[in-house]
Structures are given as C-alpha cells and as structure tokens.
Amino acid sequence: RDPWRAPGARAPIPLARRALDGDRFRRATRECLMGVAAVDALLRESGIDRDIIRGRSTALLYVTAAAYGSSNQAFVVAEALRQARTTGAVSGGTYFPYTAPSTMAGEVAIEFELTGPYGILIGGATATIDALWQATRLIADGRCERALVLAVETFEECADLYSRGRWLVKRPLVEAAACVLLVPGARRV
C-alpha cells in the first residue's frame, strides 16, 4: 500500500524539521522532534497561535504502538559498544532518560508550555481511539478547556527487529506523527 494514499482525499502534511532554539534539543530523539513538529504543524496549518494552548487549560495525550523501541534500540547498541571498548569512552547519541515514553510528553509540554493534564497510552490504533475518548472526557468533566492528542511512530532504528517478526507486522511500517486539537462545542469534540 502507498502510505501517501492512506488518508483518502486528504493530503498528508509533511513535517518540516524546524530550527529548534538552544541546546535543549541537541540529544532529543527523532520521536521527540517528530512530536514537536506535529504539534507545530497543527498550529501552523490551523492558524492557531501558540499562546492559545499554553498553560494548564490544555491536556496532552500521547499515543504510540512502537513505544520508544527506536530510542531503546539506539541506547542498547551505544551501551554495548561502550562496554566492548576497553580504552576510551563511546558516547551514544541517546541518554537513558530518552528511552522512556514519558519523554515525548515532557518535550512537547516544555516546548509549548503545557501544564495541564497529560496521559500516555501505548497500544496503537485502539489506544488512539481511547485517547480521543479520554480527551473528550477531560473536556466534558471540566478538567481542561482543550486537549491535544498526539500519536508518533518511529521504526527505522529497530527495523531489523520488526523484520525478524515479519509474520506479526504487516508492511509497510510507516513512520508518522499526527496531532489533533479537541475543543468543546457541537461537532467539535
């Protein structure tokens, strides 16, 4: 299947890698960079100012099936190389804290100054549906005024692991990031 045709009549929005200020993103994983880019693309394409989502009135729900497999793989490989060398240190590109799924929510929250409720759901498409439902509940219960639901999947760094279990995973493995903003109102939530 052609992943560019998957959305039907809607064209995918390419995630341009924007210049991120400062040293904070120097060691950020691709998952984090894709997550920040997806939220940025949502705001840009919708004409929404960052100030609208800033603060405690915006919830963030992060969803993934791959759940940081890529960053964990990069960390394990770098650590194995470091331990295999007896002289000098091998510096891996991934810090241990970046191997946790909570890193995505944290980096996005820091970048967009989100301090509202957040959650992490691991499990793919069904988890995404659950995240959308949870977002509507957070809004309906008055725990937030709006909710971002962010899904990010990366596979490149651990493609060999997926190829070994190829009977379990249908092709193609498509790396993607998507974000929606839910707000209250008729046909909006």
Task: Set out the residue ranges of the language-model regions.
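Conserved "HGTGT" condensation-loop signature of ketosynthase/thiolase-family condensing enzymes
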Residues: 1-117, 121, 129-130, 137-144, ...
